[in-house]
Amino acid sequence: MSSSNLFKPIPLGRKVLQHKVVLSPMTRFRADNDGVPLSYVKSYYGQRASIRGTLLITEAVAICPRAKGFSNCPGIWHQDQIAAWKEVVDEVHSKGSVIWLQLWATGRASDADTLKESGFHLESSSDVPVAPGEPVPRPLSEDEIESYIRDYVTGAINAVQGAGFDGIEIHGANGFLVDQFLQASCNTRADQWGGSIENRSRFGLEITRRVVDAVGKDRVGVKLSPWSTFQGMGTMDDLVAQFEHFISRLREMDIAYIHLVNTRWLEEEEPGIKTHPDVDNQTFVRMWGNKTPILLAGGYDADSARRLVDETYSDQNNIMVVFGRHYISNPDLPFRLRLGIPLQKYNRDTFYIPFSDEGYLDYPFCQEFLDQQDVDQVVVAA
């Protein structure tokens, strides 16, 4: 596997990565009650940065208090949060790796009680609940939409200029606020923010445009999940046309990358479930072309990741593979993948334990990795 294109260097933004294995953004609930990352969060990311030239994307990070729909998730709107994230960034950079922060607003997918405790209401593009019987969100006003856009810009500036992140990823996937505007299954507005493909795209595109203006196009990526039905998404009739329009406009902005989530893993975990024939996003991958990197996520393992870059997209040199659960349990994942070393099994029960380092810092590096040289000197590029 060491000769795979998975282990060839690739430029992304202002850096050159040494391989194409990416740490997925994954919520872990390791922030305090004020949204400040706990002291050992820097060790978690530092462990996974130990192979030089690795791209890490942080867990979803709330852009403002009203965007933080769950307890013990981190934010990026006040100085204590920025300072804690700077420690994380410094740790990752000391290992020779690269880290981007994911900007997040939860919208109707929030825990309503958590918002209420903080003095906020459940809100979204429209008054459509995430599922039948769930709390009904309040549609955002024009002024509130503008406020959210400004908060995304401030979050990007805080991340890049304040904490020193190499870039930011706008979370437009998985049924959170940007997705709630993008898809007609949620967005029933009849103003400039809904009612047509162009109008439903406006919120996410305006966020992206203004963030690009604030921090630079080579420091901005966008994550989308076109086929996901998670949190009430993926059921609109013109889904392909909607995402073709949105992605084509992102491409025109020449952003650093696009991050696409497929739902192939659902077929494995939920036998009998029906997924779209293009669940692997080939339509959108081909549409993006070789312009800038394409990050693909969706339950990949060593074999399927290799096939993706070496066979499915052998004619494109910009495909990167995003790993989530396997990266939780294997902090040296790129090293293991290149040498064919068996992966450690993850423990789902420890994924989301607030104020605990169990299942967070205690997965060991493989002995081969430790024997090779000091962990901060390891490079896996072929």
From Swiss-Prot:
Q: Enumerate the residues binding FMN.
A: P25, M26, T27, A60, Q102, H171, K223, G299, G324, R325
Cited function: Probable inactive dehydrogenase; part of the gene cluster that mediates the biosynthesis of fungal ergot alkaloid. DmaW catalyzes the first step of ergot alkaloid biosynthesis by condensing dimethylallyl diphosphate (DMAP) and tryptophan to form 4-dimethylallyl-L-tryptophan. The second step is catalyzed by the methyltransferase easF that methylates 4-dimethylallyl-L-tryptophan in the presence of S-adenosyl-L-methionine, resulting in the formation of 4-dimethylallyl-L-abrine.
UniProt xrefs under Gene3D superfamilies: Aldolase class I
Specify the species: Claviceps fusiformis
What does the similarity note say? Belongs to the NADH:flavin oxidoreductase/NADH oxidase family.
Q: Which domain of life is it from?
A: Eukaryota
Q: Print the keywords alphabetically.
A: Flavoprotein, FMN
Q: What is this protein called?
A: Probable inactive dehydrogenase easA
Q: Where does substrate bind?
A: H171, N174, Y352
Enumerate the InterPro entries for this protein.
Aldolase_TIM, OxRdtase_FMN_N, Oye-like
Which SUPFAM superfamilies is this protein grouped with?
FMN-linked oxidoreductases (SSF51395)
MF terms in GO: FMN binding; NADPH dehydrogenase activity
